[in-house]
Amino acid sequence: MATLVAPTTLDGLLGRVRALEPLIREHASRAERERRLAQPVSDALRDAGFFRIFRPASRGDGLELDPVTAFRVFEELSRIDSVVGWNVTLANACEVFGAWYSDHVTEEVFGSPKTVMAGSWNPPRKAVPADGGFRISGRTVFSSNCRSATWILGLANVFDDDKRCVSMTAERR
């Protein structure tokens, strides 16, 4: 399937959702059984742009949708299959954090239209300064869509001299 970037009107986006409905329904029981999106569905969602809903248009491939339009799309995907709606919504929630990335990290993470995010916020990991960066420790118990993701986003509490601040980390999968 070719990558689509237009149209980004609500009607156009809902048309894309409807076009994927037969494929999503065909693989719904498999997704439920395997507890993950079927690869053909994940690929079709990616190619249709549904993992780039909140990505900035300045990236060249981002849809940069407003929240009302985005959630209407999430709702329609969820109507077809809640597993699909959940995974697409959470993947896009991870993209929101890209607004705070440095230019270098933004280019590395979002430099490809095939980027798919997954993330886990709970429980947060612990990060302490180390040579060249941070040493992160902790355990992630759950992350929706991680098997389809090309990048994993995780929350880490940064500790330095008894002070704590919140930071996000991304890791290529």
Describe the function of each predicted region.
Residues 1-15:
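Basic/polar N-terminal segments that are highly enriched at the extreme N-terminus
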Residues 20-28:
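N-terminal capping segment at the start of a domain
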Residues 155:
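Glycine-rich anion/phosphate-binding loop at the beta-strand->alpha-helix junction
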